[in-house]
Amino acid sequence: MIPKEQKEPVMAVPGDLAEPVPSLDLGKKLSVPQDLMIEELSLRNNRGSLLFQKRQRRVQKFTFELSESLQAILASSARGKVAGRAAQATVPNGLEEQNHHSETHVFQGSPGDPGITHLGAAGTGSVRSPSALAPGYAEPLKGVPPEKFNHTAIPKGYRCPWQEFTSYQDYSSGSRSHTPIPRDYRNFNKTPVPFGGPHVREAIFHAGTPFVPESFSGLELLRLRPNFNRVAQGWVRKLPESEEL
């Protein structure tokens, strides 16, 4: 059992650790690979970094990150354009004037959507939320006829384009089964020949001695086949047996 005197120093250690530890400013640590990569890509004297920066500018050109103030400016300019078009809708035509008015079609959203605001007759209204730009896509469209290209046309049969030409007399397949060969036709198909030409073998044999190939049967070929099997032979000479012995 540990005596009470030894427990007191041990309980005083957590109190010492709770005090603020003095810290030193040792500067920047070693750069990690990601920091080095970003630093190299920001240089102006490297061909790879220049290509990366050019690509970043091209990406930023087609990436629109509009702030709230810019969205309000665009919305006000859009309302001004709608009002201008409504004012220019009255066009004189000959002796009488025909009045044309522009209509702004706004899709009806869900009844509890606070982001949808309907435009008035003069085109005034607040900016709608991005979720209310196309409310028709939230549910299937109704009353819209199906598009024609969605139906695949399956042909009932196949009609060969050469059918009308093969019906003529010139294209009849029964009259000429093969192409006629002319008299001066030469066949250039190559066949294996011995070295020196095809007439070397004929020069070996004389004209008076016709060459007759020998007919070897299977058993004759097996008899003439050399045997390489070896049998152990002793020092005693093998003598043929005779009646005298």
Swiss-Prot record:
The modification Phosphoserine is found at residue 31. GO terms for cellular component: Z disc. Residues 67-108 are annotated as: Binding to FLNC. Residues 180-201 are annotated as: Binding to ACTN2. Its main location: cytoplasm. Expressed specifically in skeletal muscle and is enriched in fast-twitch muscle fibers. Not detected in heart. It is found in: Cytoplasm, Myofibril, Sarcomere, Z line. Pfam families: Calsarcin. Residues 50-67 are annotated as: Binding to ACTN2, PPP3CA and TCAP. Keywords: Cytoplasm, Phosphoprotein. Residues 93-134 are annotated as: Disordered. It comes from the Eukaryota. Belongs to the myozenin family. Myozenins may serve as intracellular binding proteins involved in linking Z line proteins such as alpha-actinin, gamma-filamin, TCAP/telethonin, LDB3/ZASP and localizing calcineurin signaling to the sarcomere. Plays an important role in the modulation of calcineurin signaling. May play a role in myofibrillogenesis. Interacts with ACTN2, LDB3, FLNC, PPP3CA and TCAP. This is Myozenin-3. It comes from Mus musculus (Mouse).
